[in-house]
């Protein structure tokens, strides 16, 4: 049984092997649940964050696969989510596979999910990411991998929680209320971010060129009723008096709006008009008839907290 944690007992430890010998790393891994926990524990135990992080990653694997050899746990720690550890363990016989072979297989897996995300993400998660990225969500690059981020008004806190629940598999690094000063006023918002993962590299490549988010047929072709519903929740606005929906697609240029207009006509039989305001912003507006058809397409996928986006009360 591991000794009680203390600064005195940790001073003699040297590197990862010392942490393995001194502590139950499975129990250590359970102590890190949110952003900041690793640093606090590192300071408490006087262990370098990088070394402690490696130990905690191994502990997570040993917690999921108690019978796995400890030498293989460090290799499998390259699989960042619990789900993919289980998928990987089912796909390969990890008990008899050599450590050298496992290194290659883990590297291969991380390359594969960057090309085919549905090896790991569910269709519902994929649709949420696609729909959100059509709106104001972003993919941020950090070193070689990326993370998924969004920010919503505090009025959409329930919607933010709903998204967070759907994406909990991807190790949430941030979910917090913030206040930002924009010009002479403050905006109260919810900021969300996952930890980095190779699978988000796929979405970065799909949506970005030269660090700018763009619209192209490849991404539009992935839109279905569920991802479209998320897009409407993020960027849609219902005009109550006249009964139509506007998509506030301000960050895209005219050619991209023409592409979106063509897509809606071909995929959903809708014919939005391209609007222009303030001398610089384009948007899409659905006429009353098309708005009714659009609502029929997406309503079953709209969270109740966002029913106002389609002109209904949030019951």
Model-derived regions, located:
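General secondary-structure propensity
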Residues: 4-8, 28, 38, 112-123
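P-loop NTPase nucleotide-binding/switch module
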Residues: 2-20
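Short, Lys/Arg-enriched, disordered terminal segments
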Residues: 1-3, 314-315
């Amino acid at each position: 049984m591991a000794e009680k944690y203390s600064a005195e007992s940790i001073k003699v430890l040297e590197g990862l092997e010392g942490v393995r010998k001194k502590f139950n790393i499975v129990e250590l891994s359970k102590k890190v649940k949110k952003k900041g926990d690793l640093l606090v524990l590192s300071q408490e135990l006087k262990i370098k964050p990088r070394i402690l992080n490696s130990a905690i990653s191994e502990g997570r694997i040993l917690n999921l696969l108690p019978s796995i050899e400890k030498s293989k746990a460090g290799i499998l720690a390259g699989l960042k989510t619990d789900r993919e550890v289980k998928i990987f363990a089912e796909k390969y016989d990890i008990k008899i596979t050599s450590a050298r072979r496992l290194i290659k297989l883990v590297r291969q897996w991380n390359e594969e999910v960057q090309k085919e995300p549905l090896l790991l993400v569910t269709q519902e998660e994929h649709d949420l990411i696609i729909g959100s990225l059509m709106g104001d969500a972003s993919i941020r690059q950090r070193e070689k991998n990326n993370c998924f981020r969004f920010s919503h008004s505090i009025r959409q806190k329930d919607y933010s929680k709903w998204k967070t629940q759907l994406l909990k598999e991807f190790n949430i690094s941030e979910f917090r209320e913030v206040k930002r000063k924009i010009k002479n006023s403050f905006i109260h918002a919810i900021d969300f971010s996952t930890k980095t993962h190779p699978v988000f590299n796929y979405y970065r490549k799909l949506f970005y060129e030269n660090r700018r988010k763009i619209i192209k047929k490849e991404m539009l072709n992935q839109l279905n009723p569920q991802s479209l519903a998320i897009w409407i929740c993020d960027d849609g606005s219902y005009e109550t008096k006249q009964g139509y929906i506007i998509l506030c697609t301000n960050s895209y240029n005219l050619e991209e709006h023409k592409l979106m207009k063509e897509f809606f006509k071909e995929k959903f039989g809708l014919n939005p008009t391209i609007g222009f305001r303030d001398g610089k912003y384009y948007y899409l507006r659905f006429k009353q008839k098309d708005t009714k058809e659009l609502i029929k397409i997406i309503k079953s996928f709209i969270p109740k907290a966002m029913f106002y986006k389609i002109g209904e009360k949030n019951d």
